[in-house]
A protein has these predicted regions:
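Gly/Ser/Thr/Pro-rich low-complexity, intrinsically disordered segments
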Residues: 1-125
Length: 125
């Protein structure tokens, strides 16, 4: 969240001061930033080869220009995931965890079950 309470995504690389951070999710690679597909750039900064190249179950989070948060779980590689998030109207989007960690629950219904027990989850009300 920025200082005005708006959801935001920022790429800080290695240089970040945590003194003013109130909420933080570390994930990657970035998919979209300010409406631009940044997967190619993100792959250079995100060295986990399997995440950069393989197709599998993935989760992503994005924000539209109107501030709407989009959560998605799909079978895709990060290149395809960026295209999907762009098609859904996101201007900023980030790949989250994938594989057996991907799960999605909405409106009290299971949309995609996780393949294992999860230690950490994102919850929006």
């Amino acid at each position: 969240m920025d200082g005005k309470g708006n959801e935001t995504f920022k790429y800080y690389g290695q240089d970040i001061s945590y003194s003013k951070v109130t909420e933080l999710v570390a994930a990657g690679p970035m998919l979209l930033q300010n409406g631009k597909n940044v997967v190619a750039e993100s792959k250079n900064n995100y060295k986990e080869g399997k995440i950069n190249s393989s197709t599998g179950q993935r989760s992503a989070i994005g924000i539209t220009k109107n501030g709407k948060v989009i959560l998605l779980t799909a079978v895709a590689n990060v290149d395809k995931l960026a295209l999907i998030m762009n098609d859904l109207g996101c201007i900023d989007a980030m790949n989250l965890d994938g594989g057996a960690s991907s799960a999605l629950f909405a409106n009290g219904k299971v949309i995609k079950n996780a393949g294992r027990n999860l230690n950490t989850v994102l919850i929006f009300k």
